[in-house]
Curated annotation (Swiss-Prot):
Fourteen ClpP subunits assemble into 2 heptameric rings which stack back to back to give a disk-like structure with a central cavity, resembling the structure of eukaryotic proteasomes. The keyword Protease applies. Cleaves peptides in various proteins in a process that requires ATP hydrolysis. Has a chymotrypsin-like activity. Plays a major role in the degradation of misfolded proteins. Required for degradation of response regulator CtrA, thus contributing to the G1-to-S transition. Required to degrade DNA replication inhibitor toxin SocB, this function is probably the reason why the protease is essential in this organism. Belongs to the peptidase S14 family. This is ATP-dependent Clp protease proteolytic subunit. GO terms for molecular function: ATP-dependent peptidase activity; ATPase binding; serine-type endopeptidase activity. The gene is clpP. Disruption phenotype: Essential, it cannot be deleted. When depleted for ClpP cells arrest before the initiation of chromosome replication and are blocked in the cell division process. Deletion of socB permits slower than wild-type growth of the clpP disruption.
Amino acid sequence: MYDPVSTAMNLVPMVVEQTSRGERAFDIFSRLLKERIIFLTGPVEDGMASLICAQLLFLESENPKKEIAMYINSPGGVVTAGLAIYDTMQYIKSPVSTVCMGMAASMGSLLLAAGAAGQRISLPNARIMVHQPSGGFRGQASDIERHAEDIIKTKRRLNEIYVKHCGRTYEEVERTLDRDHFMSADEAKAWGLVDHVYDSRDAAEAGAE
């Protein structure tokens, strides 16, 4: 079966650096990690969450006071995997700036909003989508009832996280997330998901001054 993500990863370019000991080759993502840049791309799932959390913890150990930049292009995915990344972002000492490129949907939008205050950015043509969690269950009626109760608790917790980071009331968040709600970059800024919309590095650097 064709997997576009795996195919793309097999085509990752290499960067060659000259050192005092000769040449050293890095894949492009490892080289960017040296610059404290993390890419969160594709569906959010357990394997990806482990890699993102490991990178966050490593960069904190390198310099706990220096900013980490996380670039997000994700349709969302597994709630527990996304919350593992979220909790790690909040746990570490290093501030994490978030940048949306392409799309941040579902858990992707929550992680975008979870960046350090004043350091949440969207590129101008990015799309952001928020909604309530969904799930399907099979089995005995009592088991289905327990799963339903758990997903309602999860929904409340996710709503509380959006309230915390977006400055909206719980009622506003619940109403907006009731169905798939798509936003432009400017609409996401107005809603409180991001702090800035920049179309160039110069604009971002000028805004940071």
